[in-house]
Regions:
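Concave beta-strand-loop units of leucine-rich repeat
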Residues: 1-3, 7, 12-25, 29, ...
Length: 151
């Protein structure tokens, strides 16, 4: 299992990166990979997404099964269209409200109680919120694609 990905720090022209199913905690070396479009970091121990803040070409992001709590570093990555964040420690979806091109979002098994920040994501076609303690589902019911999910 890979724990350290610092060897990638000079791969600035990389477009696709899959380092899923490892034991990676620190993704600081990714901060200068401005060409990245697809990144797969699933099944690691990533908590801090700050290094992704300026990776504005990202469109497909797999971050499920990590220890992520704060989504703020993703809020300006407006071209993300596919985002997988299942099995993390997320409570606040507010940063995702700015991702206007988001088409598919999976957030199963987090600690989300309010889905209101997602209500204006007009291109969203698929949303999974299973196993979250969402208190008021009325905002979801008003979304055009709403499909029943279970808590």
């Amino acid at each position: 299992r890979i724990k350290d990905i610092r060897i990638l720090k000079d791969a600035k022209d990389m477009v696709y990166l899959n380092v899923g199913r490892n034991d990676i905690k620190d993704i600081t070396c990714l901060k200068d990979m401005k060409q990245l479009e697809i990144i797969s970091l699933e099944n690691n121990n990533v908590k801090d997404l700050t290094p992704l803040t300026e990776l504005t070409n990202l469109c497909d992001v797999d971050l499920y099964n990590n220890v992520i709590e704060d989504l703020t570093p993703l809020e300006h990555l407006e071209f993300i269209s596919y985002l997988r964040l299942d099995h993390n420690a997320i409570t606040d979806l507010t940063p995702l409200s700015k991702l206007k091109y988001l088409r598919s979002l999976t957030l199963k098994a987090n600690y989300i109680t309010d889905a209101t920040p997602l209500k204006d994501l007009e291109l969203l076609e698929a949303l999974r919120l299973d196993d979250n303690p969402i208190q008021d589902t009325s905002v979801l019911e008003s979304m055009k694609f709403y499909e029943k999910f279970t808590n």
